[in-house]
From Swiss-Prot:
Record lineage: Bacteria, Pseudomonadati, Pseudomonadota, Gammaproteobacteria, Oceanospirillales
Superkingdom as given in the UniProt entry: Bacteria
InterPro entries given in the database record: ApaG_domain, ApaG_sf, Uncharacterised_ApaG
GO biological process: error-free translesion synthesis
Protein name: Protein ApaG
Domain ApaG: 2-127
Pfam family, one: DUF525
Organism: Chromohalobacter salexigens (strain ATCC BAA-138 / DSM 3043 / CIP 106854 / NCIMB 13768 / 1H11)
UniProt xrefs under PANTHER family: F-BOX ONLY PROTEIN 3 (PTHR14289), POLYMERASE DELTA-INTERACTING PROTEIN 2 (PTHR14289:SF16)
Length: 127
């Protein structure tokens, strides 16, 4: 299975949402667009997600759920799946990292795809 994991790439593009944020109320909204590239010869299905969100206050939140944005997409060989979601933090800086549980539909085996840590930073914050 580790061989298949090496062929699944996850790219993240975070963005601060100033219009939805209220810093005076300690509400900082970030969107993140994720592209999952399947560079393997097998179709995969994204079954579940696990996020660890660390806020600037040190508070850690774990989020687990089925699929992403209400879907459990099937991603064929050479294809990609792109979606946008959001996170609301109590401070201007945070870090997200996690993993996807995917199914190799050829072998009918589940495997984990790690998502490297990425930074969420509001305006005038060090990136």
């Amino acid at each position: 299975m580790s061989e298949l994991v090496e062929h699944i790439q996850v790219h993240v593009e975070p963005e601060y949402q100033a219009g939805e944020s209220a810093p005076g109320d300690q509400r900082y909204v970030f969107s993140y667009t994720i592209t999952v590239h399947n560079r393997s010869a097998h179709s995969i299905q994204l079954l579940a997600r696990h996020w660890k969100i660390t806020q600037s206050s040190g508070k850690v939140q774990e989020v687990r759920g089925k699929g992403v944005i209400g879907q459990q997409p099937l991603i064929g060989p050479g294809q990609q799946f792109r979606y946008t979601s959001r996170a609301v933090l109590d401070g201007p800086v945070g870090v997200m990292e996690g993993s996807y549980t995917c199914l190799d539909t050829t072998e009918q085996r589940a495997f984990e795809v790690p998502i490297a840590a990425f930074r969420l930073a509001g305006p005038n914050q060090v990136h």
